[in-house]
């Protein structure tokens, strides 16, 4: 999304917040124009290209106040789930994407998604400088999905359907102490390298790089969903799988299990 498109989203957040409507989930379709100064054309307008993007803004609380649900703020992972659900509904599996950490003028911290080496989206925390300029004090999470690029990569996609799995999923978590330059994409790839048959998904649900950690280290809290299509998993199978995951992380990522 271009600067004007981002500004409109932040203006809407500022306006709503001033009227005590602070729990927001907004989206907008818009055109983005790119100038390529490396090319020389007889007609200067040909140096410009146009693509369609979706902007997503999330801020405030996850749920409206009620007696059944504990009041919690939205987080980066709220946005991540929304973006990945869009990809999934369009047939783009996140395990087939290259996912890298990013930090730039827009995002103080975030993730970039590429599918077949094509950039399809960026999500993250809106930079504090941008929020300050927009008179916004709350955390804002922003996603820029490249709709034109997404349509191109899925144009040959054929929908397939499989029966719902009969047997229950099992979740296991690991806390990994790793070097700061180790990316989540590496953690995910190593997991599927170690276990292809029953590992369904890998997700990061907490990152910590503050006090009480060795210099140059960070802590990832990672969840793993395991499921067998033919039978219910037993403790022995689960423990064997988790042991393989731990071994590959220690051996190939230099991780310590916390």
Kindly give the residue locations of the regions a language model identified.
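A carboxyl-terminal module marker
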Residues: 27-30, 39, 49-50, 55, ...
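Polar, glycine-rich mid-to-C-terminal structural blocks
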Residues: 1-35
């Amino acid at each position: 999304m271009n600067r004007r498109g981002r500004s409109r989203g932040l203006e809407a957040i500022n306006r709503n917040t001033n009227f005590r409507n602070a729990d927001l989930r907004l989206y907008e379709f818009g055109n983005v124009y790119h100038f390529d100064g490396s090319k020389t054309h007889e007609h200067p307008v040909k140096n410009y290209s146009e693509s369609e993007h979706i902007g997503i803004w999330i801020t405030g609380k996850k749920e409206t106040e009620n007696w059944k649900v504990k009041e919690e703020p939205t987080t980066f992972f709220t946005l991540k789930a929304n973006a990945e659900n869009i990809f999934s509904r369009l047939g783009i599996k996140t395990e087939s994407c290259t996912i890298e950490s990013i930090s730039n003028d827009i995002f103080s911290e975030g993730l970039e998604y590429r599918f077949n080496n094509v950039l399809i989206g960026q999500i993250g925390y809106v930079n504090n400088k941008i929020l300050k300029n927009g008179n916004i004090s709350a955390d804002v999470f922003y996603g820029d999905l490249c709709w034109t690029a997404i349509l191109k990569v899925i144009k040959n996609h054929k929908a397939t359907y499989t029966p719902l799995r009969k047997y229950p999923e099992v979740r296991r978590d690991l806390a990994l102490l790793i070097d700061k330059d180790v990316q989540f994409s590496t953690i995910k790839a190593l997991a599927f390298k170690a276990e292809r048959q029953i590992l369904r998904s890998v997700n990061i649900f907490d990152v910590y790089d503050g006090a009480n950690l060795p210099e140059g280290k960070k802590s990832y809290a990672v969840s793993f969903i395991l499921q067998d299509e033919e039978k219910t998993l037993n403790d022995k199978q689960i423990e064997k799988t988790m042991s393989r995951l731990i071994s590959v992380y220690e051996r190939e990522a230099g991780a310590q299990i916390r």
